[in-house]
């Protein structure tokens, strides 16, 4: 139903999402979906061949009126596909421009991040199986932190920071008891403390958590670079 190849990106200082699956046939939705939410194949829609009957059957169309629609489309693809073939060879070359929406996003781009998260939430809510999937829960909550990190980094508009947080806080499909049953990782448990705090305190906590996670990530990358240089 889906064929994915590897790719090379030029013009980007930061690493692009890798394809970390070997060449071969991946059968069964559980395998296809788990490899996606674990970040083993990339979110971008390009360099994927998808069966036309499959697209029509599942109405797998791009959401109109937004950017970053790849995030929503690829997630739906992963949730629906029963089989996937991977070719671990470069079949696509992508040159990232300095003024691309990934490197210099506008407020509209950031607003669309919030919209996309809402669409993904609605899609998960439409299926009990998706709601009960532990990896989906970890993916969705981690996506909130990822999007909020982009928002904090690319705009200083604190009003937008807060309004985005309110959306992320409200898009919660698991109760505290259900969260525990889904066995989140320790880092996610720390992140999710914001849910039990009063709203504004939760906002401050979530903001601090996301910033701290970013600084720790940058520090680890720099340390690896230093050791590699030696």
Task: Give short role names for the model-derived ranges.
Residues 156-230:
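Membrane-interface aromatic/basic loop that binds lipid-linked glycans or pyrophosphate carriers
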Residues 1-85, 92-106:
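Donor-binding/catalytic cores of nucleotide-activated saccharide
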Residues 131-140:
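All-alpha amphipathic helical-bundle segments outside canonical DNA-binding/catalytic cores
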Residues 9, 142-145:
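Intrinsic disorder/low-complexity segments enriched in polar/small residues
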Residues 90-97, 103-130, 145-177:
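Catalytic core of nucleotide-sugar-dependent glycosyltransferases
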Residues 33-34, 137, 166, 174:
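Generic detector of well-ordered alpha-helical segments enriched in charged/polar residues
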């Amino acid at each position: 139903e889906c064929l994915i190849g590897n790719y090379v990106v030029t013009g980007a200082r930061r690493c692009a999402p890798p394809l970390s699956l070997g060449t071969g046939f991946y059968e069964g939705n559980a395998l296809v979906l788990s490899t996606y939410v674990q970040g083993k194949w990339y979110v971008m829609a390009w360099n994927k061949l998808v069966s036309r009957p499959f697209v029509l059957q599942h109405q797998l169309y791009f959401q109109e009126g937004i950017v970053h629609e790849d995030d929503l489309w690829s997630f739906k693809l992963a949730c629906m596909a029963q089989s996937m073939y991977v070719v671990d060879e470069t079949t696509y070359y992508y040159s990232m421009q300095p003024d691309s929406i990934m490197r210099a996003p506008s407020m509209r781009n950031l607003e669309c991040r919030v919209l996309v998260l809402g669409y993904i939430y609605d899609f998960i809510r439409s299926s009990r199986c998706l709601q009960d999937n532990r990896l989906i829960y970890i993916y969705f909550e981690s996506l909130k932190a990822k999007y909020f990190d982009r928002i904090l980094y690319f705009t200083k508009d604190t009003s937008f920071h807060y309004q985005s947080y309110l959306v992320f806080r409200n898009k919660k499909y698991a109760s505290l008891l259900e969260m525990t049953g889904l066995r989140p990782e320790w880092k996610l448990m720390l992140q999710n403390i914001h849910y039990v705090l009063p709203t504004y305190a939760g906002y401050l906590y979530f903001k601090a958590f996301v910033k701290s996670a970013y600084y720790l990530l940058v520090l680890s990358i720099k340390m690896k670079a230093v050791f590699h240089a030696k």
